[in-house]
Amino acid sequence: MLCSVRRRRVHPGCPRHKLTSRLDKAAAAVDYSHFMSVLFFKRFLQRPFQIASIVPSSKALVERVASKIDFNGPRVIAEYGPGEGVHSREIARRMSRDSHLLLFELDRAFSSDLKRQFAGDRRVHVIHGDAARLPQELERRSIANCDYILSGIPFSILKIDKKRALLQKTYDALSPGGSFIIYQVTNELKQHATIFEHAESEYFLQNIPPMFITVFQKAPTLNGRRRDVEWSRAPVNRQA
């Protein structure tokens, strides 16, 4: 018996109707909170190298990255290139009421959307600008240092001088024992971030595309002295 189709309606007894019903039920069970939005797709098409990925981070990646942060107590956290804010929302959800989250976003559309998302949260500060402004933004808010700095920006496309300058500012902005956490398609930054005393990486497959998650750690005690190093000579504990 042929299926009766009229105005795109499918007869309830048709096998096609049963199939679409199953698909609808399966779709309803999927968490779409981390899927690509229209805004994300448009910005990727306009700035593919800046956005770096065609889809936002998966829920699994977001949770894995957040697991690298100790949320017990007030924390100061900065994020470079939050995009749609999938990591930002998870961090804000977990951090205490006395914590601060500074979001540095170059893209005006993303920045405006982040301000809308966190309009009622005084802990979250959205900065439309370069991550290199971190020292000034901390000083402006009378914050001494960050406990954690998170980044998903594609460091591989930055010129070497800009890359090293941002790494130096990141290192200086961290408290002793603080961590710089990155998630990247490649792990090339590890060979440049020799200013950090310790680094550990993992290859995370539950994301499209798979990502390297690397945690760079600043030494717990440095006797209060600034540490500028010869980039090509500084040792780093490289654990895969």
Residue map of PLM features:
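A short glycine-rich, Lys/Arg-flanked "PGG" loop and its adjoining helix->strand segment in the class I
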Residues: 164-176
